[in-house]
Regions:
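Short hydrophobic/Thr-rich beta-strand motif most characteristic of the beta2 strand and flanking loop
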Residues: 32-39, 47
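Positively charged, aromatic-enriched patches within helix-turn-helix-type DNA-binding elements
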Residues: 102, 157, 164-236, 240-243
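Short, Lys/Arg-enriched segments at the junction into DNA-binding effector domains
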Residues: 7-10, 121-194, 198, 258, ...
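His-Asp phosphorelay/catalytic-motif detector in bacterial-type signaling
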Residues: 8, 52-54, 77-82, 210
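Basic, amphipathic DNA-recognition helix from helix-turn-helix-like DNA-binding domains
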Residues: 66, 72, 76, 81-154, ...
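Charged docking surfaces used in two-component/phosphorelay signaling
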Residues: 22-30
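Active-site beta3 strand of CheY-like receiver
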Residues: 51-57, 62
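Acidic catalytic/metal-coordinating carboxylates
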Residues: 40-43, 54, 66-69, 93
Length: 270
């Protein structure tokens, strides 16, 4: 058993339905998690700030601040994984939730087993707390990397350091969520190589992620916005229509596994 598996996951549940929070608390505690529940958005923000949880389960329809605004605000100080919960099934709610920084979206009513599976899938991903994020002064040195290594590299105006979990563009620090950082790291490690949406899901979210490929597009859109990338004329992350994404290189085309990236996905082995 790894050291990570020995740590008790901390979960904050923010929902104004007592019956649901009691059910979720009981189920997660039986799974070995420490759970705190809150009935409104302000209390949820305070709990996240005070307890620094690994996971936040956040209802969309909350009294006072709605779940979208709570998620937006907590992203100012926390990189806890966030799963949005909602009785509404509109796709726009799912898109908005992912846009404001949520990692997943689960429609009510849901199976406790499915909830636990999604929590476990996110928690298995490597994480680093905000306490380990370097100060702006520390980050400035990243752009001076003499040569690429397994843990740090420079791609034109972009520099990444995996150990520091830091990104700079033209020497300026860029704040990314863990998912956004991992997406950028995976793509920029091998410029020009096409990575399919399913490969991104498998390698960033985890092979047991329950959801559809649309989540990748939403997080890539957030990433592009933060690094100043124009989707119509990208300088960093380029869309390969119908397949996935690649990090731009001087070459106009490069193949992944020897295949033309313009081939339909059905002809690429998964």
């Amino acid at each position: 058993m790894s050291a990570a598996e020995l740590v008790t996951p901390r979960v904050v549940v923010v929902d104004d339905e007592p019956a649901l929070t009691d059910l979720v608390r009981g189920y997660l505690e039986r799974e070995g998690m420490a759970v705190e529940t809150c009935a409104d958005g302000l209390a949820g923000l305070a709990a996240v700030r005070d307890t620094a949880p690994d996971m936040v389960l956040l209802d969309v329809m909350l009294p006072g601040l709605d779940g979208f605004e709570v998620c937006r605000r907590l992203r100012d100080f926390s990189d806890a994984y966030v799963i949005m919960l909602s009785a509404r099934t509109d796709e726009i709610d799912r898109v908005v939730g992912l846009t404001v920084g949520a990692d997943d979206y689960l429609a009510k009513p849901f199976s406790p087993r499915e909830l636990v599976a999604r929590i476990r899938a996110l928690l298995r991903r490597p994480r680093s707390g905000w306490a380990n994020v370097p100060t702006p002064g520390d980050r400035g040195a990243i752009g001076n990397t003499a040569e690429d290594t397994d843990n740090a590299w420079t791609r034109g105006e972009l520099s990444m350091d995996l150990r520091r979990r830091s990104v700079t563009i033209r020497g300026a620090a860029v704040e990314l969520t863990n998912l956004e950082f991992d997406l950028l790291a995976l793509l920029s490690r091998e410029p020009g190589v096409v990575v399919t949406r399913q490969q991104l899901l498998d390698r960033v979210w985890g092979v047991d992620f329950v959801g559809d490929e649309h989540v990748v597009d939403v997080h890539v859109a957030n990433l592009r916005r933060k690094i100043g990338d124009d989707a119509t004329r990208p300088t960093h992350v380029e869309t390969v229509r119908g397949i996935g994404y690649r990090y731009r290189t001087g070459e106009r085309r490069r193949l992944v596994h020897g295949l033309d990236p313009n081939l339909s996905r059905s002809r690429i082995g998964h």
